Structures are given as structure tokens and as C-alpha cells.
């Protein structure tokens, strides 16, 4: 590998890339919003980005101009979370390119500062095609800037493209900094299965957020259950079983609980989603609040702990669960799984 980097960084030349694999073609740094904007402009005006090194010969590349279908903003509490999300997003560059801004805050009570790394990854779909390239901006901000991340995000957005906020950790629903980010977004991506406690309070706050803002929400906890939903639905594709649907009056869901804290500290977001899906498909609604009910450990309980039935009293109604959206949530989830598999293989080696 040969890198052509000045003081602020710049294009990187590699030996020919593998078709379909993302390759780092640009890397630079900036210490202000204005500096980030200048580096983003430099990426697409640099003639060196269109060249590749093949032995001693420099050949022209067919590099597409900036290709983006959305703005993706990732709020990463820790550096390793941001890096994992970036690896996932880079896998999608060829199919779902985006301008990605990965934000981390540090030392909110100290002086205001900003440090940014600007990268461009390109994917060659086939030998005779133009490469698809997308930008990734890693921003760490401290002091006043770290408390107002929306002020950093706003000038870096590509206008007229949808904005998606991906919050891998537990979003602080109700806090003003988070609300400021939500207000500029079209979609929020979360993973409710990792929230503290039962997760019910966070679900309530998230539902209140959606009532207040025209914000679509995708939760990996719901997406991961798609095979369960398909399996249950396929049972009632059998004509002899279909009549039983009309006689369902009560649903009990049994799930694994934490060994160290029991049902009171076990996240039940996925069981709640499953109950909600069943209720929506059957035209039911919740008659009284959902709550975990303690039960003794049984020999047939899941291996991770005891069994706690989530009893839901449901009756006929008009509830409906709407899924879908403009962004490839399923594709992101698949890329996440692929990243985890690569990490496991690396550890084994």
C-alpha cells in the first residue's frame, strides 16, 4: 500500500481492490465544522482519487461522484461502538451508500473542542464499472460542542436526503440534546433488547416521542424476530388450524430471565413486541397494562435462567402494527451479523 498524505491527509492509493469489497480511498482530519466541509469538498475535486497503483503503473479509475441515498447519523457513546457501526455501514456502501456521521462526546464540562476524521470508502461493483463511493465522518466533541451534537450534525447533512439517526446504546428519551437530534431526523434506529431493566419505561418514552414527532422508528429487537413471526403465521396457513384464530382470548409468553436479578431486571422488549404483533394481527388491543409475572423456576425453563410468563389480557379491537421504511434495516442487521461472525473468526485464529 502507498499513501499520498499531506498535512491534512488526502487520497490513498492501493493495489487494485477486490470487486464488491469496500476500500479506503481517502483519509484526512479537521478541527472545525468549516474544516470538515472543506475536506468533504476536497474529496471529490482531487484528481488522485481517480487513480490506482498497479506495480509501477498508475492507471485511471472510473470513480463515481459522491453517491448517497440518505444521511446516517450514529450516536456512539464509546469508540468501539462507533468503529463497529462503521464496519457495518461500509459493508453496505455498494448497495446503500450514505453520508455517515459518527458522533461521540467527551468531557462535557471542559473547554469546547472538536476533532474529526474524514474518510471515503469506494466499492467496485465489477471490473468495467464506476466505483460507488461514500463518506464517513468521525467526530469527537468536548465542552459546549459535546452537549449540542445537533449543531455539529446540521451543517454536515446533504440537503434533500432523508436523515436517519442510529442510536446503538439506550437513547436518553426526554433529554433536550436527544430531542434536538430527533427533531431533524426522519427515522430513528434503536436496539431495545439492550436497554436497562425491563425496558418498558423506555418503550413508553419512545412511543410518546413518536406521538409528538413525525418520526419513523425501527428497532432491531423487532426485526430479529421476523423468523418467529413467519413461523407462527405459517402454522395458520394450514386450513384446519385457521378456525382456532377466532377463539384466542389470552396470550402468555414465556421468556428467559436473568439469573442474577430475576424477572424485575430482565429486558422484556422482545416479548412485548411479540405480544404486540400477535395483538395487531388478530385485531386485538391491550385491556390492562403489560407486566411481568413472577413464577417459580421449572425444569423445562430456558437454560439462561428461570421462566417468567408475560400474561397479556387482550380483547378484540382495531390495533395495527406498521413496519417498513426508507432505509435498509434488514440489510444493516445482516451486515451486523456478518461483522460479528468476522470478529469470532478473528478471535479463533
Where are these regions (language model features)?
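An N-terminal, globular interaction/scaffold subdomain
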Residues: 1-174
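Glutamate identity and glutamate-enriched acidic tracts
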Residues: 2, 21, 34-39, 80-83, ...
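Aromatic-residue detector
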Residues: 3, 14, 21-26, 31, ...
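Serine/threonine-rich low-complexity intrinsically disordered regions
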Residues: 15, 77, 258, 306-309, ...
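Gly/Ser/Thr-rich loops at beta-strand to alpha-helix junctions
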Residues: 78-81, 145-146, 170-173, 195-198, ...
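Extended, well-ordered protein cores
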Residues: 93-246, 303-343
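ATP/pyrophosphate-binding catalytic subdomain of soluble kinases
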Residues: 224-291, 297
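Internal helical hairpin/lid segments
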Residues: 263, 267-308, 312, 316, ...
Amino acid at each position: 500500500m502507498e499513501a499520498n498524505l499531506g498535512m491534512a491527509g488526502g487520497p490513498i492509493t492501493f493495489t487494485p481492490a477486490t470487486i464488491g469489497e469496500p476500500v479506503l480511498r481517502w483519509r484526512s482530519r479537521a478541527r472545525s465544522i468549516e474544516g470538515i466541509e472543506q475536506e468533504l469538498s476536497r474529496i471529490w475535486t482531487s484528481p488522485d482519487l481517480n487513480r490506482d497503483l498497479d506495480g509501477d503503473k498508475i492507471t485511471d479509475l472510473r470513480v463515481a461522484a459522491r453517491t448517497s441515498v440518505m444521511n446516517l447519523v450514529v450516536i456512539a457513546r464509546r469508540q468501539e461502538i462507533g468503529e463497529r457501526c462503521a464496519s457495518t455501514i461500509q459493508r453496505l456502501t455498494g448497495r446503500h451508500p450514505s453520508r455517515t456521521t459518527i458522533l461521540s462526546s467527551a468531557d462535557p464540562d471542559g473547554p469546547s473542542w472538536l476533532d474529526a476524521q474524514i474518510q471515503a470508502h469506494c466499492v467496485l461493483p465489477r471490473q468495467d464499472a464506476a466505483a460507488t463511493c461514500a463518506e464517513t465522518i468521525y467526530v469527537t466533541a468536548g465542552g459546549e460542542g459535546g452537549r449540542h451534537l445537533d449543531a455539529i450534525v446540521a451543517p454536515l447533512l446533504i440537503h434533500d436526503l432523508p436523515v436517519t439517526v442510529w442510536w446503538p446504546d439506550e437513547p436518553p428519551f426526554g433529554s433536550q440534546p436527544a430531542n434536538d437530534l430527533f427533531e431533524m431526523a426522519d427515522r430513528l434506529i434503536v436496539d431495545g433488547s439492550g436497554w436497562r431493566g425491563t425496558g418498558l419505561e423506555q418503550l413508553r418514552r419512545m412511543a410518546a416521542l413518536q406521538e409528538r414527532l413525525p418520526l419513523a422508528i425501527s428497532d432491531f429487537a423487532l426485526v430479529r424476530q421476523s423468523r418467529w413471526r413467519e413461523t407462527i403465521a405459517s402454522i395458520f396457513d394450514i386450513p384446519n388450524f385457521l378456525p382456532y384464530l377466532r377463539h384466542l382470548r389470552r396470550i402468555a409468553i414465556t421468556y428467559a430471565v436473568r439469573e442474577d436479578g430475576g424477572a424485575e431486571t430482565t429486558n422484556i422488549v422482545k416479548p412485548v413486541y411479540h405480544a404486540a404483533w400477535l395483538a395487531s394481527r388478530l385485531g386485538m388491543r391491550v385491556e390492562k397494562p403489560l407486566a411481568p409475572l413472577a413464577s417459580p423456576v421449572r425444569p423445562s425453563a430456558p437454560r439462561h435462567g428461570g421462566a417468567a410468563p408475560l400474561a397479556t389480557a387482550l380483547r378484540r379491537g382495531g390495533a395495527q402494527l406498521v413496519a417498513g421504511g426508507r432505509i435498509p434495516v434488514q440489510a444493516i442487521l445482516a451486515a451486523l451479523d456478518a461483522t460479528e461472525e468476522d470478529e469470532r473468526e478473528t478471535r479463533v485464529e
